[in-house]
UniProtKB/Swiss-Prot annotation:
Citrate synthase-lysine methyltransferase activity is inhibited by S-adenosylhomocysteine (AdoHcy) and oxaloacetate (OAA). It comes from Danio rerio. Its EC number is 2.1.1.-. Protein-lysine methyltransferase that selectively trimethylates citrate synthase (CS) in mitochondria. Seems to conduct trimethylation in a highly distributive manner rather than in a processive manner, and thus introduces a single methyl group per binding event. This is Citrate synthase-lysine N-methyltransferase CSKMT, mitochondrial. Belongs to the methyltransferase superfamily. Its main location: mitochondrion. The gene is cskmt.
Length: 254
């Protein structure tokens, strides 16, 4: 599947300092090395939100690029599930991913869009209210939440989520100086809050040779073990994108 919208690959972030759309090059320079810092993201979304009319900011690509992957997965999950599926868009920023799932999923969903930046959360709340975003299924719900995803188990109950989506959050953390530990914490906590039938999908431009080794290492010794897989999403402008699927697997009884 060819990606039909390309916006910002993290590995090319430094090139943005030359782009006409950015006037404060210091913002991008700081972002490159401080992607794990809340204050950095508050500044990022404040400066982007002050540029006039609101526009969703997407890392990698927008919802159309993964629509044919996400919606069938939700439909399959709903066949053996009573009530709305609980979906977490982790590190949502001002992406339209969560709202698009809410407005296009035929099966009932409860979409929680969570971000560490209250600035991003407020921008998204205001935008969806002003555009009167409506659900595809009348039983669906959309909520925005300020949340540090390293504290996920303090907010969500064990085995309460059906699907966790990560479009750029882990990539941002592992590329920052002090973020790899946080990325590992998020992965292990995700496994704790996912239902046994659930999945954690990471969308990334990192090559499987590197990401799979990291994922398999991080899930070892976790309270909930996991199966790890990957499929290629597509390629555009020389950048390949992948979907890494991490699924909880109960430990065998001794």
């Amino acid at each position: 599947m060819l990606l039909n919208r390309f916006l910002v690959p993290l590995r090319s972030l430094q090139k943005l300092t030359q782009a006409r759309r950015w006037h404060q090059t210091s913002l991008i320079n700081d972002l490159v090395v401080n992607m794990d810092k809340k204050a950095m993201w508050d500044r990022f979304y404040t400066e982007n939100g002050s540029k006039g009319q609101f526009k969703n900011f997407e890392w990698f690509f927008g919802f159309p690029s993964v629509k044919d992957l996400v919606l069938p997965a939700l439909q399959a999950m709903s066949c053996s599930h009573s009530g709305p599926l609980h979906i977490l868009d982790m590190g949502c920023g001002t992406s339209a991913l969560g709202p698009c799932i809410y407005s296009t999923s035929p099966c009932a969903v409860r979409v929680t869009c969570a971000d560490i930046s209250p600035v991003a959360v407020k921008l998204m709340e205001e935008h969806t209210k002003s555009t009167s975003t409506q659900p595809c299924n009348p039983s669906s719900a959309l909520v925005f939440l300020e949340l540090d995803c390293t504290q996920m188990t303090g907010h969500f109950k064990s085995r309460s989520l059906d699907l966790i989506l990560d479009k750029g959050t882990t990539d941002a953390l592992v590329r920052s100086k002090e973020g790899q530990v946080k990325a590992g914490q998020i992965l292990r906590q995700s496994l704790q809050v996912l239902r046994p039938s659930g999945s954690f999908l990471q969308f990334s431009d990192e090559d499987p040779d590197a990401r799979l080794i990291w994922l398999e290492r991080e899930v070892q010794g976790a309270e909930v073990t996991a199966d790890v897989g990957v499929q290629e999403i597509g390629e555009l402008r020389g950048v390949s994108y992948f979907c890494y699927q991490i699924s909880p697997r109960s430990r065998p009884h001794s």
